[in-house]
Curated annotation (Swiss-Prot):
It holds the Pfam family GSH-S_N. It catalyses: gamma-L-glutamyl-L-cysteine + glycine + ATP = glutathione + ADP + phosphate + H(+). It comes from Buchnera aphidicola subsp. Schizaphis graminum (strain Sg). This is Glutathione synthetase. SUPFAM superfamilies: Glutathione synthetase ATP-binding domain-like, PreATP-grasp domain. Pathway: Sulfur metabolism; glutathione biosynthesis; glutathione from L-cysteine and L-glutamate: step 2/2. Its cofactor is Mg(2+); Mn(2+). Belongs to the prokaryotic GSH synthase family.
Length: 320
């Protein structure tokens, strides 16, 4: 093992000016890194660029603190080669669009030069958070991915109660429930598919959502033993915290462990080091790989440092 040094850790995220530090997982990760004396380099997606095949970014070194009124301070702004960093956390929220994909190409050039990128850029492209569950259909409800109105209509008539989701969003955005004989079926489907120009996901509605949508975190191939169960507010189909769901920390049950233990080594092999599984009842509904959340809520209630496990992994990889 080589002599330990203070690491240079970059992060690509949405504007830090807009976060709630009590709930923001990216902030919690940076706080743990700073506590260990590592240098933090802040970037937004439009700061990344390529020149002569080399990846660069306009970075800001940053200091942070737990004070919502004054929680960050930029120290120095400069352009650097991403090769100068030891690790980069790609924590940009969806939409998962072509701009996001282009950013992963830039990060992949740094990865090829030896920079540790979490999560692995290629796997961020390959593992769409909605579609990726199709590789694990033994754990999912009946799921259709299509942009054909006729196929969605037939699925609806077969199931009577369905959920429709865009493939590139997050936080419950654009999610619709269509019950039997809903007169709004056509307008919802036409809007989501943009008149058969965009794919969407259609799933059988799971009534168990009234008891919560569980977020199960997996770090470096190991499931965290507690989930954050998000309970929908009254009259709401979606349980996401972003739309008013209530969070409760609960132990994983036997089915949760079965799903998490099956997926964990597969995710690690793909370089997906920090992942959030969404489970309703005993069904896997999404695999969140871009910027999984709910770290703060679990750490607040339980004696576990999820951020510490992640930074331990980064240090072990760099120091080995």
């Amino acid at each position: 093992m080589r002599k330990k040094k203070n690491l240079k850790i970059g992060i690509v995220m949405d504007s830090i000016t807009l976060i709630n530090i009590k709930k923001d997982s990216s902030f919690a990760i940076l706080l743990e890194a700073q506590k260990r004396q590592h240098e933090i380099y802040y970037m937004e997606m439009n700061d990344l660029y390529l020149r002569k095949g080399q990846s660069y970014a306009t970075t800001k070194s940053i200091e942070i603190q737990k004070n919502q009124n004054n929680y960050f301070k930029f120290i120095q702004k400069k352009d650097i080669s991403l090769n100068e960093l030891d690790a980069i956390l790609m924590r940009k929220d969806p939409p998962f669009n072509t701009e996001f994909i282009y950013a992963t190409y830039i990060l992949e050039r740094a990865e090829e030069k030896g920079v540790l990128v979490i999560n692995k850029p290629k796997s961020l492209r390959d593992c769409n958070e909605k579609i990726f569950i199709s590789w694990f259909s033994r754990f999912t409800t009946d799921t259709l991915v299509t942009r054909k109105l006729s196929k969605i209509h037939n699925f609806w008539k077969e199931k009577n109660d369905i959920i429709l989701k865009p493939l590139d969003a997050m936080g419950g955005k654009g999610v619709f429930r269509i019950k039997k004989d809903d007169p709004n079926f056509s307008v919802i489907v036409e809007t989501l598919t943009n008149y058969e120009k965009k794919y969407c996901m259609i799933q059988t509605y799971l009534p168990e959502v009234q008891f919560g949508d569980k977020r199960i975190l997996i770090v470096n191939g190991k499931p965290i033993p507690w989930s954050l169960t998000r309970i929908p507010k009254h009259g709401e189909t979606r349980a996401n915290l972003a739309v008013g769901g209530e969070g409760r920390v609960q132990k994983l049950n036997d089915k949760d462990w079965e799903i998490a233990n099956y997926l964990a080594p597969i995710l690690k092999k793909r370089g997906l080091i920090l992942v959030g599984l969404d489970v309703i009842g005993d069904k896997l509904t999404e695999i969140n790989v871009t910027s999984p959340t709910c770290i703060c809520e679990i750490e607040e209630k339980k004696n576990i440092s999820i951020t510490g496990i992640l930074i331990d992994y980064i240090e072990d990889k760099i120091y080995k």
